[in-house]
């Protein structure tokens, strides 16, 4: 089998995006457009990957190196196209680093939804001997190069701006993807000229050279148009985002996940689900999220980098943000509505976290409860603790963060402040309104608040009477 070398064209400016960010670094499904293409190329086990950069080259190359390192993969090779004089000129920059003895698979960095199996068929069509073009039929092919045939054989690709009236009526178009024997590609690139309306070097002109040299030119059709749709504007990016999310929603439902409305679901990472999972509308999942069996997610939740165990319920409007340290929700736990779990939150089985409760870098043991209006930061909370409304851990002294330990079976009354570092002993009770800054013994009642005084003859100050 011939080795495959992937060439990714990513030098364009993307003027219609009206952005300072390189076009291929705009995100779709939480990942840059080009990352989708790179991940697809990696699935083909290519010998090497070469990225053609130009506009925003430093930013793009730096990002791709970092992304490869994060995935434990080798960084791609880079070549620069400066200035940008067309697609043919772009691929000419690859010639010095492209081996002669393989198949060059040429991809576009702004076409994120291409499938690995589609590219594999394209490579197989090439077979190391033919020029294989990925094509698709479009209802409105305006702006695309038309596939001109003689019978079944492809004779040429005519760019839209150079096409005559008859050619503009052709609905089969070239998508920008091709597989070609590398040695022949190099020879044909050397023959390109810019004798056209745009005064650019068109990669598509190699088709006529192939025909003249007696090399078979074959078309490999894409299964659906969305695979080959590119991004040139914010509107097109939004349209592809919806298509991508629908693709992901469909895949999850085929696995048995029950989505209340697949049109109101966003996945910007990876989501693994057990059996009988239910997800209500307008939920966003990012990073790596795992949902166990019988998990229910209420409407309008945002969940990133979290593991949610069997039978847990996440009520409406809950934010779970595990980006740096992850979040774990134990079996049968109840969270929300309007709760916030930040990085490092660890909930044991049957924990209850209610409305307007926030946890960061804190753990709660089995059956512990914080049902409303509370904050726990840098805390270790034991089993069966009841943490009252309005209570907080004061964990930050302005320079360093400190640990609070609340041992098992403690009851913390409402509106308490636990000033870290501090430990509340097992089975103890903290009276409402207390400010606790010293360790307490097990089983005792601790009250740390000012004495209540009532003044019978006190009169409220009055404003002077208006004249």
Task: Give the label of every model feature segment.
Residues 1-5, 31-124:
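Conserved N-terminal catalytic core of the sugar/cofactor nucleotidyltransferase
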Residues 258-447, 452-453:
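Structural signal for interior beta-strand "rungs" in well-ordered beta-sheet cores
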């Amino acid at each position: 089998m011939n080795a495959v070398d992937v060439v990714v064209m990513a030098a364009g400016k993307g003027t219609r995006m009206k952005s300072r960010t390189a076009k291929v670094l705009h995100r779709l499904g939480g990942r840059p457009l080009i990352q989708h293409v790179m991940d697809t190329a990696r699935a083909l086990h290519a010998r090497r990957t070469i990225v053609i950069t130009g506009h925003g080259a430093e930013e793009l190359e730096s990002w791709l190196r970092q992304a490869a390192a994060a995935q434990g993969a080798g960084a791609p090779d880079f070549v620069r196209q400066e200035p940008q004089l067309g697609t043919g000129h772009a691929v000419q920059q690859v010639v010095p680093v492209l081996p002669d003895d393989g198949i060059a698979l040429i991809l576009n960095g702004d076409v994120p939804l291409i499938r690995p199996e589609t590219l594999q068929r394209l490579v197989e069509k090439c077979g190391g001997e033919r020029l294989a073009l990925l094509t698709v039929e479009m209802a409105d092919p305006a702006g695309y190069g038309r596939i001109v045939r003689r019978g079944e054989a492809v004779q040429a690709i005519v760019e839209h701006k150079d096409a005559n009236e008859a050619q503009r009526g052709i609905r089969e178009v070239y998508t920008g993807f091709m597989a070609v024997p590398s040695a022949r590609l190099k020879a044909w690139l050397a023959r390109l000229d810019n004798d056209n309306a745009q005064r650019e070097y068109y990669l598509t002109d190699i088709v006529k050279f192939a025909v003249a040299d007696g090399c078979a030119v074959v078309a490999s059709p894409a299964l659906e148009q969305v695979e080959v749709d590119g991004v040139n504007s914010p509107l097109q990016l939004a349209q592809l985002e919806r298509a991508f999310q629908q693709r992901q929603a469909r895949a999850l439902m085929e696995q048995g996940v029950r989505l209340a409305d697949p049109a109101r679901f966003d996945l910007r990472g990876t989501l693994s689900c057990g059996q009988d999972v239910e997800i209500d509308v307008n939920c966003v999942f990012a990073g790596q999220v795992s949902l166990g069996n019988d998990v229910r997610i209420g409407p309008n939740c945002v969940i990133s980098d979290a593991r949610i165990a069997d039978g847990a319920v996440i009520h409406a409007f809950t934010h779970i943000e595990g980006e740096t340290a992850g979040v774990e929700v134990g079996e049968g736990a109840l969270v929300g509505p309007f709760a916030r779990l930040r990085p490092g939150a660890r909930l044991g089985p049957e924990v209850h976290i209610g409305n307007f409760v926030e946890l960061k870098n804190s753990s709660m043991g089995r059956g512990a409860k914080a049902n409303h209006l509370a904050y726990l930061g840098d805390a270790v909370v034991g089993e069966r603790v009841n943490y009252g409304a309005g209570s907080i851990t004061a964990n930050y002294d302005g320079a360093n963060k400190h640990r609070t330990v609340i041992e098992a079976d403690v009851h913390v009354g409402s509106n308490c402040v636990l000033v870290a570092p501090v430990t509340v002993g097992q089975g103890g009770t903290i009276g409402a309104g207390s400010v606790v800054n010293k360790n307490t013994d097990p089983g005792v009642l601790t009250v740390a608040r000012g004495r209540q005084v009532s003044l019978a003859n006190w009169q409220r100050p009055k404003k002077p009477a208006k004249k």
